[in-house]
């Protein structure tokens, strides 16, 4: 007998939804709750281990892309990565304990990289038409740098401004359903309109690689 038991949320009269969403209006998204809420329903699969290594001190220092069909657990993994950034000590402890339990040295010896601020958003909800709107709103110093950008009178924030902002507080930007969001972009009309359908393709690395001295994520 395995002595398996259903979790409490499955013992009620109504079955709850099982889809993982990073953020919700009622603040019940996986990125808005404590790390234990997602860790308690997570098994360290090969994909989860790969994702955790990507945010560890041994990471390859390049943007990370999760690809797969709907329902393959990408949002779940992103939620784990969010908390690996925001609550690195708790997630590292969870991973190390699983590593000892499974006899898996990559997990038992995992050391997560701290010091980053996670900005996670399911962008296909179109709450933010431009990525810098999201970054300025969520970054701890976002209001200050948004003011500097507005004073410039430019259609795009320059790279130097973004790098200055990320030097003050390094950021890990986690975007769910990015491709769906990108495919829905359209250019603004007129010669002064922002070419929203073009800038992410040419500048995505600026927004996905944030420097802190010689380190990028």
Which residues fall in each region the model found?
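Residue-level preference for the first positions of well-ordered beta-strands
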Residues: 61-65, 118, 170-172
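Substrate-engagement module of ASCE P-loop NTPases
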Residues: 159-167, 193-217
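A short hydrophobic beta-strand->loop->alpha-helix junction that borders the nucleotide-binding pocket
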Residues: 117-127
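Walker A/P-loop-proximal flanking segment of P-loop NTPase domains
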Residues: 1-72, 79, 85
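Conserved P-loop NTPase "ATPase switch" module shared by AAA+ and STAND
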Residues: 165-197
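Phosphate-handling catalytic cores of nucleic-acid transaction enzymes
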Residues: 26-27, 60, 89-100, 189, ...
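Short glycine-rich substrate-engagement loop in P-loop NTPases that contacts/grips substrate
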Residues: 127-162
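Flexible phosphate/Mg2+-sensing switch loops adjacent to catalytic phosphate-binding sites
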Residues: 82-117, 144-156, 194-198
């Amino acid at each position: 007998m395995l002595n398996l038991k259903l979790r409490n949320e499955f013992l009620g009269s109504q079955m709850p939804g099982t889809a993982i969403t990073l953020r919700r209006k009622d603040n019940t998204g996986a990125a808005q709750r404590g790390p234990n809420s997602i860790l308690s329903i997570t098994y360290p699969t090969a994909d989860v281990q790969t994702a955790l290594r990507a945010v560890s001190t041994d990471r390859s220092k390049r943007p990370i892309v999760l690809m797969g069909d709907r329902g393959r657990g990408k949002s779940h993994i992103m939620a784990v990565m969010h908390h690996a950034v925001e609550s690195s000590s708790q997630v590292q402890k969870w991973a190390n304990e699983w590593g000892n339990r499974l006899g898996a040295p990559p997990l038992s010896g995992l050391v997560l990289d701290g010091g980053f601020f996670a900005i996670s958003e399911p962008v296909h909800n179109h709450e933010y038409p431009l990525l810098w709107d999201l970054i300025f709103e969520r970054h701890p110093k976002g209001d200050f740098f948004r003011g500097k950008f507005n004073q410039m009178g430019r259609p795009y924030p320059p790279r130097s401004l973004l790098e200055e902002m990320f030097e003050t507080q390094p950021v890990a930007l986690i975007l769910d359903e990015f491709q769906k969001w990108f495919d829905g972009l359209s250019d603004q009309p007129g010669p002064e309109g922002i070419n929203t359908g073009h800038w992410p393709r040419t500048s995505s690395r600026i927004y996905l690689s944030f420097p802190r001295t010689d380190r990028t994520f």
